Amino acid sequence: MLYHASQTGNIRVLEPKVSNHNAPLIYFSAKRENVLVYLSNAVEKYCKETEFAHNGKWHKWASYGFEPDGILRLDEYYPNAIKDTYKGVSGYIYCSNDIYETESDIKINNVVATSEAVPVVSVEFIEDAYAEILKAEKAGLIKIRRFEDMSDKMLAWIKNTIKSEYTQAENEPDYRYFLKAKFPFLSADC
């Protein structure tokens, strides 16, 4: 079984959408817990909650990686990032099988990508993505590296990375708005 997350309900057939890889694709994971991170986008959620006017495509924010053993690790780049991003967010996990993998060069652990429409076999409603993420953490299925547990070296890396991201986001007002709100050091430096 392969899993795909969406905030959109009542999908019978998953259709490819233009992705971060600049091609129409649908991404699936062989691990249900790994798709939980796609139930919310921190940039979009924050901008909507604060009534930031934006007409274009929302910048995708994803601060996760994988442990050497293949377990997904969520990283909090700012205090309470995971709670802010996922608490109160509902969505759906769609299950499919018999997927024809058309993109084999996607370098994300346990991910299968296809450019073809895929029928949905079953669906699970997730009432609160944050609660579900914490449940997966407790079960040892994912790891969370909380902001307050970050090393000084990691905090310095985050600061440098965010400054670079801000500079490169010249044409992404939604992303810059989000970054300035969540990383106060940008206000002093930019």
Model-derived regions, located:
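Conserved NAD+-utilizing ADP-ribose enzyme module
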Residues: 42-190
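Surface-exposed, glycine/proline- and aromatic-rich loop segments on solvent-exposed faces
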Residues: 24-28
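Short, conserved phosphate/pyrophosphate- and ester-handling motifs at nucleotide-, phospho-/glycolipid
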Residues: 31
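ADP-ribose/NAD+-binding catalytic cleft of ART/PARP-like enzymes
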Residues: 1-23, 38-41
